[in-house]
């Protein structure tokens, strides 16, 4: 798509929705967004906030769905999770044999997709020589760093 951002994001969200729906036999929808921010600091802050937000949402979702699987209604499960501290949510899961800290990182904080430079063997038809060329490929990272390390990780990819 020649890096047309909105098109790429639209296609990725649609592909994720379709794949998840087919795999689980029920409709699902994923969204994506583009945010134009005026400087690097705000970009890093935004991504750090999204990273923490993903963690909060995952903890809430694990608590909610654990309660739903135990037979709680939508409203009772929602009410039971609402107002609990982070520690109380961890305890609730642990009491039900779920150690949130041992879940895969991508389930707790999401994952990253970004361009990565790779070397590829090639042939130059004009010179008749073999050689290596640099190419940009999309890389999926399921083990993102935390805290300040995550901020440095984001900054490294935007400058």
Feature locations, PLM:
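Regulatory and interdomain segments flanking nucleotide-handling catalytic cores
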Residues: 1-159
